[in-house]
């Protein structure tokens, strides 16, 4: 999701067989994005505590106690490595690693999420080679942690579709070259990786390859009129299922696995029904859908309409009971 983070901080063919994955009784991945380290994107590198923050690990443990098992941790590439193929900012890396380790030490999954929309310093990433090197360097830091998941880049948009394919493949190649061979890789698509527009925009991503066969296609789906996730109203009680229908068939037709990496709805009865519609559709097709992650928790959301931050976030108090039915 694209938000004004500075403001927020202040206020039909034969289906192929999908790769098999051992599941929990419910979703394999069910969790929350933990926003903060990507805030203040207009201030690079920015000041920790002023322009951006890191998730509160105690809040994460609270969410784990409620039944969430997956936490997507967004960060900015430019803060981690001021030059794409250069060295790390050690302070930023230390803070990121600390959050990742807190999640995985608790037995949950930690998604390392480059929240850059296919850009670096505001410019579209055009060098697949540099992107591969960047991911090789980053993945090497987490190669021994089997509970880490790599998210290639958040919400590519307004980019050449072949470039999106090439960047995703470069990320996969770099991650595996780093010796990170046990982890899942979440790949994202163009047009903000929307599930409802996936078949129109991202069909070519079916050609991505991974020697470990651990690619998961991450799609995002909001339930408001324009699918942007910027309104607290939802189109209808059934819009969730409707918006993932074509993507579900694409996964089945191509023998792929998917996850909804962002979803949300407002604190009202129509949205609660719409969220249930979405999650029920994913559960009914759990041969291809591995789960979903709420947008979002994080310590700086204050009165944000989708905040899952314990213990007084609007979604934490108003939507958690709906989500608990899908936990284990």
Curated annotation (Swiss-Prot):
Residues carrying sugar: 95
Record's signal peptide: 1-17
Any one Gene Ontology cellular component term annotated for this protein: extracellular region
Thermal activity profile: Optimum temperature is 52 degrees Celsius.
Active site: 155, 262
Main location: secreted
GO molecular function: cellulase activity
Keyword Transport: no
pH dependence: Optimum pH is 4.0.
EC number assigned by the record: 3.2.1.4
Subcellular location: Secreted
Family: Belongs to the glycosyl hydrolase 5 (cellulase A) family.
Function: Has endoglucanase activity on substrates containing beta-1,4 glycosidic bonds, like in carboxymethylcellulose (CMC), hydroxyethylcellulose (HEC) and beta-glucan. Involved in the degradation of complex natural cellulosic substrates.
Record's protein name: Endo-beta-1,4-glucanase B
Lineage, highest ranks first: Eukaryota, Fungi, Dikarya, Ascomycota, Pezizomycotina
Name of the encoding gene: eglB
């Amino acid at each position: 999701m694209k938000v004004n983070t500075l403001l927020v901080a202040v206020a039909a063919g034969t289906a192929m067989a999908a790769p098999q994955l051992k599941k929990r009784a419910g979703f394999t991945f069910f969790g929350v994005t933990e926003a903060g380290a990507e805030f203040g994107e207009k201030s690079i590198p920015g000041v920790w505590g002023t322009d951006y923050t890191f998730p509160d690990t105690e809040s994460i443990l609270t969410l784990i106690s409620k039944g969430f098992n997956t936490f997507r941790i967004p960060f900015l590439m430019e803060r981690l490595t001021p030059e794409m193929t250069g060295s790390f900012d050690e302070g930023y890396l230390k803070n990121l690693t600390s959050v990742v380790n807190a999640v995985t030490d608790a037995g949950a999954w930690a998604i390392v999420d480059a929240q850059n929309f296919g850009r670096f310093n505001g410019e579209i990433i055009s060098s697949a080679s540099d992107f591969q090197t960047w991911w090789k360097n980053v993945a090497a830091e987490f190669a021994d942690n089997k509970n880490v998941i790599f998210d290639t880049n958040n919400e590519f948009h307004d980019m050449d579709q072949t470039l999106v394919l090439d960047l995703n493949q470069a990320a996969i190649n770099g991650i595996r070259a780093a010796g990170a061979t046990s982890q899942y890789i979440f790949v994202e698509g163009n047009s903000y990786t929307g599930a409802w527009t996936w078949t129109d925009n991202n069909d070519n991503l079916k050609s991505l390859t991974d020697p470990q066969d651990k690619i998961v296609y991450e799609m995002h789906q909001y339930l408001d009129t324009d699918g942007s996730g910027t309104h607290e109203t939802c189109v209808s009680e059934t819009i969730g299922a409707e918006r993932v229908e074509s993507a579900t068939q694409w996964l089945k037709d191509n023998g792929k696995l998917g996850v909804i990496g962002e979803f949300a709805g407002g604190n009202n009865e129509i949205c609660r029904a719409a969220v249930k519609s979405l999650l029920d559709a994913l559960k009914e097709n759990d041969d291809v859908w591995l789960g979903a992650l709420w947008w979002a928790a994080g310590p700086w959301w204050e009165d944000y309409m989708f905040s899952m931050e314990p213990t007084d976030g609007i979604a934490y108090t108003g939507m958690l009971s709906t989500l608990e039915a899908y936990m284990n």
